[in-house]
C-alpha cells in the first residue's frame, strides 16, 4: 500500500507547521483528525502523555500527571500534534483530576466517535496522596460497551509500585 496522499491530509494543518501557537487556555477546537485507513479491523492506538499539567480549581496550584489514552478507531483518528497542543491547553485550566480525564475523553468521543476509548491519569502526589482517575467508553449496543464494562471492573486489579512520581 502506498503512503497517504496530500488530499488525505488536507485537514491536518498543525503537523509540520513551524509557526505553532501554544494555547494556555483550554481549547478542544485545536484537535484535528485524519481518516482511518483500516476501519475493517480492530486495533488499539495508545498515547503516553507524560507532561500533562492543569491547575487545582480551588488553590490554583499546578497538578502534574502522565496520561494514557487508548482507543479503537472507527472512521477518524486524532492527529498527535493537535492532541499534544490540546493537552497543553489545560495548563491554566482549573479543574479536578477526575474532571480533566472525563473532559478529555468526552472531547475525543465527540471528535472521533471511536468504537472504544479509555483515559487514565496518573497524577503526582499532593499532600501525600496521588490520584489516578480512569474513565472509559464503549459504543452503546456493541461488543465495545461490554468491553468497557469488563475493563472498568478489572482495570486496576494489581497494585502498582509507585516509582515514577
From Swiss-Prot:
It catalyses: 7-aminomethyl-7-carbaguanine + 2 NADP(+) = 7-cyano-7-deazaguanine + 2 NADPH + 3 H(+). Pfam families: QueF (PF14489). The active site is at residues 56, 63. InterPro entries: GTP-CH-I_C/QueF, NADPH_dep_7-cyano-7-deazaG_red, QueF, QueF_type1. One of its GO terms (cellular component) is cytoplasm. Its EC number is 1.7.1.13. It is found in: Cytoplasm. One of its GO terms (biological process) is tRNA modification. Pathway: tRNA modification; tRNA-queuosine biosynthesis. It comes from the Bacteria. GO terms for molecular function: preQ1 synthase activity. Keywords: Cytoplasm, NADP, Oxidoreductase, Queuosine biosynthesis. Substrate binds at residues 78-80, 97-98. Catalyzes the NADPH-dependent reduction of 7-cyano-7-deazaguanine (preQ0) to 7-aminomethyl-7-deazaguanine (preQ1). Belongs to the GTP cyclohydrolase I family. QueF type 1 subfamily. HAMAP family: QueF_type1. This is NADPH-dependent 7-cyano-7-deazaguanine reductase. It comes from Bacillus thuringiensis subsp. konkukian (strain 97-27). The gene is queF.
